[in-house]
Amino acid sequence: MNPRWKSERRRDIYHRLATEKGYRSRAAFKLLHIQRKYGIIRAGDRVLDLGAAPGGMAQVASHAAGRKGFVIALDKAAIKPFTEKNIAVLREDVLSPRVERLVLDLTGGNK
């Protein structure tokens, strides 16, 4: 990686906050902002996070959906396992014909 990029990343306030708060990426703060402003994810919701790696937004969605909610983190890149019990990881290309069946299987056939 470019040394300049690494240096800028270390100085980035959201990168530091993500590290301090245990989020996997600074992108978590984008969803946190949207969630605070619009409340798009409610307790018990099912969330499909496309292009989820490394998983910062999935973490936020997990907390917003709560224990009765469920998050599927989908990416063709590897995603480290989550400690949150309501997140399932699918390593798959979103364009794969298998994705619809895999998602339906994880949600018990409910959309």
Where are the predicted features?
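Conserved class I S-adenosyl-L-methionine
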Residues: 43-53
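Class I SAM-dependent methyltransferase Rossmann-like catalytic core
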Residues: 1-42
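S-adenosyl-L-methionine
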Residues: 74-111
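Conserved SAM-binding loop of SAM-dependent methyltransferases across substrates and taxa
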Residues: 54-66
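A generic local structural motif
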Residues: 32-36, 58, 101
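Charge-rich alpha-helical segments
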Residues: 40, 50, 89-91
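Short beta-strand element of Class I
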Residues: 68-72
